[in-house]
């Protein structure tokens, strides 16, 4: 098979030709050295490519996949699940059970539809790299939009991880040292602790040029979340309602609008439809929780027996599993605390159990998972910045260290000064996540899939999806900013 045949991926979707699904098992790359600046920096191999595809890049992109269906499902599930699960109970408390389930179904279905568009665009556009699709569709602006959205989403994810460190590590230290009351000790200050963890653990790991086996620790994250889900379900039947401990904290500004006039009966009665100033955060939180699109194409590339249908089956199984997991976590967390649930569910339990052994174990597991995940998240951010601003330059340790330090410093500043994790979920979910889920896949599809006219059902559907994504992004961002302004003028958080 020659190179022209390899790159000829713009075929009809229903064609029986195996090339339609990027199945290039016949292509055998030659084993000889190829000079490229990507050889100098391992970070750049699977990220932003140059417009002119060299032979090595062709070989890298179209090698036959070797990952099994089950492992691909695990990898995609791992890419989906993250800190967003901790904010879902808060979203349910501010939408009601019925409205939350409706929104959850819609976000799940729309996310799967956008993956369908992305996979078809990858076939038609001849690339399995997200940023490269942006370059082919809209040139440099498209590449910048894709790279910027991925970078912003990763910064948001990293911020949420460090925010968990900021608020959970002091509780773990208090429990391990059996400290009942805090008197302002520096080692119980979350701001100091997140900086120390960043400098002592995250920075050295992030400076590695090749993360190697650290990448396998990312598989620890979904296991921690499953453990967390089991504990949430179990504790629902152990915690009484109403909660006196939670009643003592009902003057929290984030819950005043819901709880200040509630009786015990009202407080323990689930609500099915809720509309308040915090409802606007529901869609961004859900969108943030389902973003996995930058990882879809690399997983597709590695899938054994690669085909669009097989990858959609992987996506369907992964999203269904996450749908069930998210629904159970949100439902049982909400039915435990009702309107008193906080933006970060795990932190809410500290108001009831304090230093309970089981939650110390949960916190330690989650802290270990998020701490080891941050260097993995920094990896693609640094690669994108290197490619955007230092393309073609040889690797330099000074630049490598400086970029890593600036990324980590910027994220620490965000974590220290942003009032709640809700604001991170909301802003990133309404901006970068909306771009990755709604806007970019549909825009790439409309631009790169040439064989379908704009009057076709597929193109009209993609156009409506694009318009809907723009409305969601602008509407959510506007309402979130208005809520911030209202809180700042009223002395809230």
Curated annotation (Swiss-Prot):
Tell me the GO BP annotations in alphabetical order: alanine transport; amino acid import; amino acid transport; L-glutamine import across plasma membrane; L-proline import across plasma membrane; L-serine import across plasma membrane; neutral amino acid transport; proline transport
Sugar-bearing residue positions? 247, 251, 261
Question: What is the protein's membrane topology class?
Answer: Multi-pass membrane protein
Domain of life of the organism encoding this protein? Eukaryota
Chief location category: membrane
Detail which positions bind Na(+). Answer: 78, 373
MF terms (GO), sorted A to Z: acidic amino acid transmembrane transporter activity; alanine:sodium symporter activity; amino acid transmembrane transporter activity; amino acid:sodium symporter activity; L-glutamine transmembrane transporter activity; neutral L-amino acid transmembrane transporter activity; neutral L-amino acid:sodium symporter activity; proline:sodium symporter activity
Residue ranges annotated as Cytoplasmic topological domain: 1-72, 120-154, 206-213, 301-316, 380-400, 445-459
User: What subcellular locations does the record give?
Assistant: Cell membrane
Q: Which Cys pairs are S-S linked?
A: 241-268
Instruction: Fill in the domain comment.
Output: The extracellular C-terminal domain controls the voltage dependence for amino acid transports activity.
Function, please? Symporter that cotransports neutral amino acids and sodium ions from the extracellular to the intracellular side of the cell membrane. The transport is pH-sensitive, Li(+)-intolerant, electrogenic, driven by the Na(+) electrochemical gradient and cotransports of neutral amino acids and sodium ions with a stoichiometry of 1:1.
According to UniProt, the name of this protein is Sodium-coupled neutral amino acid symporter 2
**Species the sequence originates in:** Xenopus tropicalis
């Amino acid at each position: 098979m020659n190179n022209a045949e390899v790159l000829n991926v713009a075929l009809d979707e229903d064609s029986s030709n195996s090339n339609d699904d990027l199945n290039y098992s016949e292509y055998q790359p030659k084993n000889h050295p190829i000079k490229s600046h990507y050889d100098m920096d391992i970070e750049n191999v699977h990220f932003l490519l140059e417009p002119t595809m060299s032979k090595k890049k062709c070989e890298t992109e179209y090698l036959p996949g070797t990952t099994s269906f089950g492992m691909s499902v695990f990898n995609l599930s791992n890419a989906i699940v993250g800190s967003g699960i901790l904010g879902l109970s808060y979203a349910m408390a501010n939408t009601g059970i019925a409205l939350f389930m409706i929104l959850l179904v819609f976000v799940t279905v729309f996310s799967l539809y956008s993956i369908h568009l992305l996979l078809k665009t990858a076939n038609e556009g001849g690339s399995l790299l997200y940023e490269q699709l942006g370059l082919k569709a809209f040139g440099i602006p498209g590449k910048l939009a894709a790279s910027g959205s991925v970078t912003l989403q990763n910064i948001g994810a990293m911020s949420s991880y460090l925010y968990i460190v900021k608020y959970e590590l002091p509780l773990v230290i208090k429990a391990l040292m059996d400290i009942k009351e805090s008197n302002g000790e520096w080692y119980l200050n979350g701001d100091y602790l997140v900086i120390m963890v960043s400098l002592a653990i995250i920075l050295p790991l992030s400076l590695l040029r090749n993360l190697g086996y650290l990448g396998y620790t990312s598989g620890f994250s979904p296991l921690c979340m499953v453990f967390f889900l089991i504990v949430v379900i179990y504790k629902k039947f152990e915690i009484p309602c109403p909660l006196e401990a939670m009643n003592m904290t009902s003057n929290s500004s984030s819950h005043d609008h819901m709880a200040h006039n509630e009786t015990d009966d009202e407080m323990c009665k689930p609500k099915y439809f809720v509309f308040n100033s915090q409802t606007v955060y529901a869609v961004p939180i859900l969108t943030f929780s389902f973003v996995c699109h930058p990882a879809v194409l690399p997983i597709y590339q590695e899938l054994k027996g690669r085909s669009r249908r097989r990858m959609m089956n992987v996506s369907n199984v992964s999203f269904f599993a996450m749908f069930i997991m998210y629904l159970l976590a949100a439902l049982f967390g909400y039915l435990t605390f009702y309107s008193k649930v906080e933006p970060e569910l795990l932190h809410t339990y500290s108001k009831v159990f304090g230093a309970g052994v089981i939650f110390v174990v949960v916190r330690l597991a989650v802290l270990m998972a998020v701490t080891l995940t941050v260097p993995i998240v920094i990896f693609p951010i640094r690669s994108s910045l290197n490619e955007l601003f230092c393309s073609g330059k040889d690797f330099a340790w000074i630049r490598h260290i400086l970029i890593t330090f600036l990324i980590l410093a910027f994220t620490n500043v965000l974590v220290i000064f942003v009032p709640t994790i809700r604001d991170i979920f909301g802003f990133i979910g309404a901006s970068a996540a909306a771009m990755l889920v709604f806007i970019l896949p549909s825009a790439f599809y409309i631009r790169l899939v040439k064989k379908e006219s704009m009057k076709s059902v597929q193109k009209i559907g993609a156009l409506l999806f694009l318009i809907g994504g723009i409305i969601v992004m602008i509407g959510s961002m506007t309402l979130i900013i208005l809520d911030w302004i209202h809180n700042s003028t009223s002395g809230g958080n």
